[in-house]
Amino acid sequence: EWLSLREPADRAARDATLLARAAQVAGPEPVVLDLGCGTGSTLRTLGGHLPDTARWHLVDNDPALLERAATEAPGRATVHALDLRDLDALPLEGVTLVTASALLDLMPTEWIAALAARLAGAGLPFYAALSYDGIMRWEPELPRDVDITSAFNDHQRGDKGLGPALGPDAATMAARIFRDAGFDVH
């Protein structure tokens, strides 16, 4: 199960300063909406920085992943099987922080702009982590590494169901989009 296999590397890759900032802006009684929650990696990672009373809204389109994620916060997690095409369906009432991990690089520019507008309109902070940036380092380096990276980046830019994804350009584009929507981007 690749989500479990990658979680230790994902956890190590998260910026500790941004995690602390996300926990702070979530407030003393946090209610976190996690988009594309998968098995609950963000809940497990960010949850360690939040009070035990933190409540979670876990959003994914895969009921099996939602069921697994909900076991991480028994009695404090509500699962929502939603299609992320419909951002108006997001349960934002009472939420103090919205999160997304390893998601923005799978989304098109228009979706990220719509998300930024929706969250700005609701006055909600956003913590995004683990967006692929197109850089790979190989050991040992081999002559075809550049070709493999290029092919992977092309695949990342493919349509994942909502239009052509930003892939390796997601972090830069999302930062610009959220800044333009009035967010402080760190």
Region spans (language model):
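Class I SAM-dependent methyltransferase Rossmann-like catalytic core
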Residues: 1-26
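Conserved class I S-adenosyl-L-methionine
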Residues: 29-38
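Class I SAM-dependent methyltransferase SAM/SAH-binding core
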Residues: 43-87
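Short amphipathic alpha-helix with an adjacent loop that forms part of the alpha/beta core around
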Residues: 86-94
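A conserved beta-strand element that flanks and buttresses the S-adenosyl-L-methionine
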Residues: 99
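Short catalytic micro-motifs in class I SAM-dependent methyltransferases
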Residues: 102-103
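Conserved catalytic/acceptor-binding region of the Class I
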Residues: 124-186
